[in-house]
């Protein structure tokens, strides 16, 4: 998992 994927996930959750 890369940073962009993590950022997208965080944005979806938050």
From Swiss-Prot:
Protein keywords: Amidation, Cytolysis, G-protein coupled receptor impairing toxin, Mast cell degranulation, Membrane, Secreted, Target cell membrane, Target membrane, Toxin
Compartments where located: Secreted; Target cell membrane
PTM sites of type Leucine amide: 14
GO biological process: killing of cells of another organism
GO cellular component terms attached to this protein's record: extracellular region; membrane; other organism cell membrane
Keyword Membrane among UniProt keywords: yes
Entry's Gene Ontology molecular function annotations: toxin activity
InterPro entries per UniProt: Mastoparan
Job description of the protein: Mast cell degranulating peptide with high potency of histamine release (EC(50)=0.26 uM on rat mast cells). and high hemolytic activity (23% sheep erythrocytes lysis at 50 mM). Its mast cell degranulation activity may be related to the activation of G-protein coupled receptors in mast cells as well as interaction with other proteins located in cell endosomal membranes in the mast cells.
Family designation: Belongs to the MCD family. Mastoparan subfamily.
Name used for this protein in its record: Polistes-mastoparan-R2
Organism of provenance: Polistes rothneyi (Rothney's paper wasp)
């Amino acid at each position: 998992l890369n940073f962009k994927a993590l950022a997208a996930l965080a944005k979806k959750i938050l």
